[in-house]
Amino acid sequence: MQFPSACRRSAAAFAAVTAVILSGASTPAFAAQDPVKYVNLGDSYSAGWGSLAPTAAVNPAFGSPACLHGGPDDVALLDQLQSVALTGDYACAGATVGATTSGIPTIAQQAAKASLDGALNSTTGLVTLTAGGNDVNFGQIIAACAADTSPQATGCQAAAAYGVQLANGVDVAGTVGTIRGYAANAKIAWLGYPRLFATAGESTTVIAGGGVMSAAAAAVFDKGTDQLNAVLAAKARSAGAQFVDVATKFNGHEIGSSGSWFNLGQYTQFNFHPTADGYSKGYYPAMVSAIKPAQLVKG
């Protein structure tokens, strides 16, 4: 039987492939893809603070009690993906964007250390961080709102407004520029903060404000968090970074809800920070959904 020339070529090609398979030789169908190299920076919300309360430890990246971090968090979960390889986690509880006398490494100092260690460089594909909350005196605003029993929470409003004013001065562009100077090819993802307190009218609210502050103050504080996130988002995007909103992932799980994902209790240093559930069910899915790390992998 005669084959047309095209069929003869196809038959010959099939025979050649079959011979290779039967001989035991192997040829990869696709070039292997290396995972995206990933560095984490930031404050306590980047450092897993509260995920294993009351446990905390010195961050081995610094080896100093000036830089503490908590337990496994969204960063560790991201590192478990085949598409991601964490080369360094430099986040420190209490870190700020601006200069400080606390001794806690600032975000810029974290980036510099990561670069010195060889973790942050031109091959880095992803950098994540949360920062800005300590620059606006997060703890002081909570204290002011908790102490405010006025019907309209006027003292809390003043404290929150001052916090937004401070947020406008946070040097997000300078921070992104510093990171970009070490890792020119990296995607930089600036993560936001969740709303902390359940408010009146939510279906999961057990007590508005969680017993920490009045319902009026809780509403003011949460609005202030939204405003902080909006400022950070605008600044991050203007600087060429991505802003990752996490607030919606925590809806129904604030302090005072029937299923809170926040620490509040005797281990006061971890109060107002996410639990393990907060990091794994709040921050982590928000990160994966927004960043899409598999798309950053290069062959």
Please give the residue ranges for each predicted region.
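A structural motif corresponding to the C-terminal end of an alpha-helix
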Residues: 74-86, 170-188, 224-245
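Catalytic His-Asp segment of secreted/periplasmic serine-dependent ester chemistry enzymes
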Residues: 194-299
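Secretory targeting and sorting signals
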Residues: 1-31
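Serine-esterase "nucleophile elbow" of acetyl-processing enzymes
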Residues: 32-93
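Oxyanion-hole/transition-state-stabilizing segment in secreted/luminal serine hydrolases
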Residues: 49, 102-164, 195
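A solvent-exposed, charged loop/short amphipathic helix patch at secondary-structure junctions
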Residues: 52-66, 141-167, 202-218
